[in-house]
Regions:
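A conserved mid-protein helix/loop that constitutes part of the nucleotide-sugar donor-binding site
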Residues: 20, 228-247
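Nucleotide-activated donor-binding/catalytic signature segment of Leloir-type glycosyltransferases, i.e.
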Residues: 266-283
Length: 387
């Protein structure tokens, strides 16, 4: 099968877990003898092509007023101009059509489409190619993709959100198949009226198993190393992590570490340092896991999936988090996940991680996820329709 996968970013560009999930999915499909082309954005001015781990990748310039992934602060008017164009980016539609007509895919699989905009669905339809879309964030509801604003989760049924997503919802009628990366995000889009003509399902993200020895054992029994990894932001709960660190700052036996991108204009960086958090910077997941015993993720937004939760469990860690979005589903599948409303840090650091059985690991293997997407592709191509 010839599959064109569209995602905002692809290796080496990365801002979160979606890029990792899309890359693992693309590589698994390529190993299963599909011809896969990934279409993604680049900050460069020219198109370029690479082959990464057996997957062909086409990088195209973003046709908008700035590159939004460089961490640089933009003015209010720059942001307004960018987002207005991103509601339906005609230039990116033309770019997508050119790639589709050259590659001639059997199916276009869209994922995160900020930058491309929903115009890529129109491009695929104009070329007579069927579309499957996977929601990995809340971009279709709100331009910040998090449905989290000024410290609060936004109501998808509010007048403001319904107005913001009206055009995107209308364009979603063009999509033939829809997948959410958790039951939560799948139901949220379905209940809001997105993808009325599509077959709906949910497929979890790929999370490869890791070799892990004795995850419940502490390197220093007298010091409990508490870790946070991810974006240093309020929706990820990093402010609450800092508050927790401040609370334990003068108590012996606790050390707090945080891994993520450090930007000096982020007020939470100073808050972290003042609270006694050791900032590790942007390091690999493996390096982070070697330096912590318990992972604390006080997420406030509705995590579409919760990739870091699964990765932490697979590295033999106990996770303390909040019951938000897809994380609640993961707790029903995986051991060693505890919720902050039910247990304290003092208690959770005493828990040893339970071993993982093969059946648990099988839920997230690249081959299994690729098989599930193959079935979703076949359903779309065979014109099956389901509610």
């Amino acid at each position: 099968m010839r599959i064109l996968i569209i995602n905002t970013l692809y290796h080496p560009y990365k801002v979160g877990g979606a890029e990792v999930s899309v890359q693992l999915m693309a590589e698994a499909l390529a190993r299963r003898q599909h011809q896969v082309l990934v279409l993604c954005l680049t900050p460069e001015k020219q198109c370029s092509n690479k082959v990464i781990n057996g997957v062909a990748v086409c990088y195209v310039p973003l046709a908008n007023c700035y590159w939004p992934f460089d961490g640089e602060k933009k003015s209010f008017f720059q942001k307004v101009r960018w987002h207005l164009k991103d509601y339906y980016n005609v230039d990116m539609r033309s770019t997508a059509m050119e790639v589709i007509r050259t590659f001639l895919p059997d199916l276009v699989h869209t994922n995160n489409i900020a930058g491309f905009s929903v115009s890529v669905w129109s491009a695929a339809k104009a070329c007579g190619v069927k579309i499957l879309h996977t929601s990995r964030d809340y971009y279709l509801f709100h331009h910040n993709a998090a449905l989290f604003h000024r410290g609060q989760n936004q109501d998808p049924e509010s007048i403001r959100i319904r107005l913001l997503c009206w055009l995107k919802k209308r364009c979603s009628r063009l999509v033939d198949g829809y997948v959410g990366i958790s039951r939560f995000i799948f139901e949220l889009h379905r209940k809001a009226g997105f993808f009325p003509n599509a077959r709906h399902s949910f497929i979890y993200n790929t999370v490869p198993a890791v070799e892990c020895a004795g995850g419940g054992c502490l390197v220093k029994e007298d010091v409990r190393r508490i870790g946070f990894i991810g974006k240093f932001s309020a929706e990820k709960g990093f402010d609450d992590f800092c508050t927790l660190a401040r609370h334990y700052r003068n108590r012996s036996g606790y050390a707090f570490y945080a891994a993520g991108r450090i930007t000096q204009d982020n007020p939470l960086i100073k808050e972290a340092r003042d609270s006694g958090v050791t900032l590790l910077g942007f390091i690999s997941l493996e390096d982070f896991m070697r330096q912590v015993d318990v992972v604390v993720l006080p997420v406030k937004w509705h995590e579409p999936f919760g990739r870091v939760v699964v990765e932490s469990i697979f590295h033999g860690k106990v996770v303390l988090t909040n019951r938000m979005g897809g994380v609640a589903e993961l707790a029903a599948l995986l051991p060693n996940i505890y919720f902050m409303e039910e247990i304290s840090v003092d208690e959770v650091v005493k828990r040893l991680a339970e071993p993982l059985c093969p059946d648990i690991l099988a839920h997230f293997t690249p081959d299994r996820i690729a098989q599930e997407y193959e079935q979703a592709y076949h359903n779309v191509l065979n014109d099956r329709f389901g509610a």
